[in-house]
Amino acid sequence: PAENRVELADGRFLDYDYLVIATGPKLAFDEIEGLGPTGHTHSVCHVDHAVKAESAWQAFVKDPGPIVVGAVQGASCFGPAYEFAFIMDTDLRRRKLRDRVPMTLVTSEPYIGHLGLGGVGDSKTMLESALRERHIKWICNAKVTKVEAGTMHVTEHDEEGKPKKEHALPFRHSMMLPSFKGIDAVVGIEG
């Protein structure tokens, strides 16, 4: 940082006035046992994950059951969880399957529509209304503690962050947004 210079992999140096390292996030599936594409939930955060989720969805609609969708603690982008819930709801309705699929949205947000931003306009009321209209239940202030095949373990917290209720949510299909971390190459670099 003192020299405004970065060394490249081939040994060359690049001088700069301002340096932005835009790497995208590290998806921290490993923070929760059983989370993610190598565990028991799906992700849409990467093209490869979305392709796998689509394949699993096609199998799911042949033998539907409960869905758990949402964002775990440490996630910083909540909109895709709502969007994906509404996409699944719409597809299930078109297939005349929605009445056979209970849906629960699990989020670490303090309230529906917080979106990691303290809300956007009247997002709380609009999203609560949209979820109710679609018969999608929700759990806020949630911490996913473990995911097993067919069961998501969730601790619901009160406003002070104290555990309020334990949930063991059954699911046949789940898409959960993971925590986002800095990639290994830049974590711990000063400046």
Predicted feature residues:
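A Rossmann-like FAD-binding core segment of flavoenzymes
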Residues: P1-V6, T90-G191
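Short, charge-rich binding segments
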Residues: G11-L14, Q58-F60
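Glycine-rich beta-alpha-beta "Rossmann" dinucleotide-binding loop(s) and their flanking helix/strand
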Residues: D10-R12, L19-H49, E160-G191
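Pocket-edge structural micro-motifs
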Residues: D10, A71, E156
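Glycine-rich dinucleotide-binding loop and its adjacent helix/turn
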Residues: I21-K96
